[in-house]
Swiss-Prot record:
Similarity annotation: Belongs to the type-B carboxylesterase/lipase family.
Function: JH esterase plays a crucial role in the decrease of JH activity in lepidopteran insects, by hydrolyzing the methyl ester of JH. It is also involved in the transport of JH.
Recorded superkingdom: Eukaryota
A single MF term (Gene Ontology): juvenile-hormone esterase activity
Protein name: Juvenile hormone esterase, isoform B
Keywords: Glycoprotein, Hydrolase, Serine esterase
Uppermost EC category: hydrolase
Signal peptide start and end residues: none
Tissue expr: Fat body, the site of their biosynthesis, and the hemolymph where it is secreted.
Source organism per UniProt: Trichoplusia ni
Amino acid sequence: LPSLSADAEAPSKIDTAYYNGTKTXXAPVYQYQFGVGXIEXLTYVFKGSQYQDIESPTAYQSK
């Protein structure tokens, strides 16, 4: 995963994240857009010290 730095694009802060209409988090969640290899606009959720792939249905159930 790309490392986050002060000069990275500012994240959009949202209070609640939804996955397929399901509420997944009550704490603030930060979403970052990255372009990695041939895959465009991968979205990661930065929560605490974890990176989670928002496209994964088990992302909010793991760890």
